[in-house]
């Protein structure tokens, strides 16, 4: 009876989470449409091309960096009932995953920032180099956000993911337009104005990641108060074991998503 009640409660929580994600997806779409026309007026077709070039490279690296790991985290975390032993296990999975995400994010940011001009020339738009540099820190922010999202989704808590998506979209809308308008009014060259618009995207992504990490840290403090002093009755898996399980789930997802993204880049090149 107790397990049936838990399953019913978890099922209701999952459906509620799906509804939240659907609403956030609709909100993000609306915000995105509200963003496009004003941005085009500020940047024009050429500036918008710089923006799109930077976004394509950013999207490709984000897919390669985060497509599989949040899914793998969710798989490893799913099925827990919130008992202290499970909280101890979830903490270890989160910390190992966060270290992996952070490493990938730093490497991804460097892969965009250092050869930015090379990326721009490969995509046939040398003027987009400044925009690619402006978006490079967003790769690290997306990786950190992915760790937190994977954690919450593994616990069937979709609210943080939904809220963070709206924060990111609003940051892109408000800050991206504000930065672009400011640069245009100051008479900045078009590539610089486009880079300022991209910087708004980066700022929104950083704000989203910061909110998720704050939410995760706050939850950890609250859960810590309820944890017993003694260890759980089973040994926690080691870091290498967790890494192997993460890789087993994440690599196939990442490879398939990467192939699709590369095909899209080829279509736009």
Residue ranges and their predicted role:
Residues 15, 52, 85-102, 243, ...:
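Interfacial transmembrane-helix starts/ends
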Residues 67-82:
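Helix-loop junctions and terminal segments of transmembrane helices
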